[in-house]
């Protein structure tokens, strides 16, 4: 796992079949709804064999899965959350930036409204699984004058024009879960891709 830079596809599918990606996600969306204690047990047991493997489980159960579960439309849940539970798609959570860290209020990624669309420019750094993911939940400022209250979350698919991924970071460990930047250059996203409400990320 550490040498190849990811867990094998066969193992990934088995993890999905065993509902590792949906320990905290309700059954109606493909999870098992067992809660956080169960997730901690799963993580602890996985870590005995591979710490990298735990990162594949953490994201869909927390930073990626819960925002979609709690704030996504039913269409977004069916399109993104359910396939992640099945192991058909991988997603990631993109907040951290080179100059702002994880402080959303000082980030430099900007989403400019253009009719029913938003034009997004910026760079996210140290994003877990960025080289592997099919989509990302990206945070961008839709109103810079409002600081943290002007931040909006967008679901952006990897094949959207202007979306690219940087080279994987050279790390001291946990290399089985690659980390890289996500670069957004004039990425055009429809308003239907907003996660939750504008300015309420």
Language model regions located:
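Internal helix-loop-helix
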Residues: 17-88, 128-135, 147
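A glycine-rich, basic-preceded beta-loop-alpha segment at the flavin cofactor/substrate interface
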Residues: 38, 158-169, 178-201
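A structural signal for short hydrophobic beta-strand segments in well-ordered beta-sheet cores
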Residues: 111-112
């Amino acid at each position: 796992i550490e040498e190849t830079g990811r867990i094998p596809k066969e193992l990934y599918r088995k993890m999905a079949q065993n509902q590792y990606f949906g320990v905290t996600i309700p059954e109606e969306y493909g999870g098992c709804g067992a809660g956080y204690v169960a997730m901690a047990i799963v993580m602890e047991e996985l870590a005995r064999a591979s710490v990298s493997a735990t990162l594949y489980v953490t994201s869909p159960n927390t930073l990626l899965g819960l925002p979609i579960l709690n704030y996504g439309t039913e269409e977004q849940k069916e399109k993104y959350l359910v396939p992640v539970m099945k192991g058909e798609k991988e997603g990631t959570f993109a907040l951290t930036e080179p100059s702002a860290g994880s402080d959303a209020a000082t980030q430099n990624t900007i989403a400019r409204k253009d009719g029913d669309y938003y034009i997004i420019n910026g760079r996210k750094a140290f994003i877990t699984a960025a080289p592997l993911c099919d989509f990302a939940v990206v945070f961008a400022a839709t109103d810079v004058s409002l600081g943290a209250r002007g931040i909006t979350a967008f679901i952006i698919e990897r094949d959207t024009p202007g979306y690219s991924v940087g080279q994987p970071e050279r790390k001291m460990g946990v290399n089985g879960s690659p980390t890289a930047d996500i670069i957004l250059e004039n990425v055009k996203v429809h308003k239907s891709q907003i996660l939750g409400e504008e300015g309420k990320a």
